């Protein structure tokens, strides 16, 4: 039997994402919501998402140490002068997590991660786990990843990037058909299903960079929202006896 941990990442990155994630939870597929503390829309996330029933969904901190888009930037909650290895000369996070290789100070990164934990908790979210935005530690800085695993342990949280992920699904064309093919490749096991739902909205126009053209994020994230809100998606998973679980159940 296959068990999925469906996770909606980037809550707090935009109001369009916050509204879409709430809709996806109502659709019955999303069971975990990862919150980004640095972007301004985290305040909106508290209004839109905080009252969701934790018997149905759990919240985690999406530890955010980079700002990947050219059209919108964010920086640390900590005073940038206290975490110089994390910021550029404008006080923003670096764009690509690979830029932190050989540069990042793990103590500074932990100070910022703790500040992010404090912020989302102060907004009223009960956290069950943490994970890493764009795999900053798990993919690029192993010593940071180990430090975040230890931080999670100290805080009584599950580190949600230690399980194998479901490989990404192409979000163009017939997304439901692609989704079914991908799930069909895994008759059993436990996988994290990373998602980034959002409404197609002008708010996402700044989400572009040298690798991601303007408009792509809005189109793809809206396609993912529609997949996750489609009643056929949940029904098909149930027919295959795919279990959908929260990290809080671990």
Regions found by a protein language model. Give the residues of each.
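Short histidine/acidic/glycine/proline-rich micro-motifs that form metal-
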Residues: 134-139
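DG-centered beta-turn motif at the end of beta-strands
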Residues: 8-11
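Terminal accessory/targeting
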Residues: 2-5, 15-125, 129, 141-250
């Amino acid at each position: 039997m296959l068990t999925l941990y469906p996770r909606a990442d980037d809550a707090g990155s935009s109001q369009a994402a916050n509204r879409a994630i709430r809709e996806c939870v109502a659709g019955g597929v999303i069971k975990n919501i990862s919150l980004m503390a640095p972007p301004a829309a985290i305040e909106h996330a508290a209004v839109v998402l905080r009252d969701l029933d934790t018997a149905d969904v759990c919240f985690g901190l999406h530890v955010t140490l980079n700002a990947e888009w050219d059209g919108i930037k964010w920086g640390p909650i900590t005073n940038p002068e206290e975490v110089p290895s994390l910021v550029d000369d404008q006080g923003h996070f670096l764009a690509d997590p690979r830029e932190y290789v050989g540069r990042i100070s793990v103590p500074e990164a932990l100070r910022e991660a703790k500040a992010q934990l404090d912020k989302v908790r102060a907004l009223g979210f009960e956290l069950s786990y943490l994970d890493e935005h764009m795999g900053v530690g798990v993919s690029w800085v192993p010593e940071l990843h180990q430090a975040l695993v230890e931080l999670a342990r100290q805080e009584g949280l599950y580190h949600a990037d230690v399980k194998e992920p479901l490989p990404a699904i192409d979000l163009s064309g017939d997304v439901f058909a692609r989704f079914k093919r991908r799930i069909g490749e895994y008759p059993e096991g436990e996988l994290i299903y990373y998602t980034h739902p959002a409404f197609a909205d002008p708010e996402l126009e700044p989400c572009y960079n040298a690798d991601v053209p303007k408009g792509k994020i809005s189109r793809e994230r809206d396609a993912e929202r529609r997949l996750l809100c489609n009643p056929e998606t949940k029904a098909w998973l149930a027919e295959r006896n795919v279990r959908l679980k929260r990290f809080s159940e671990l």
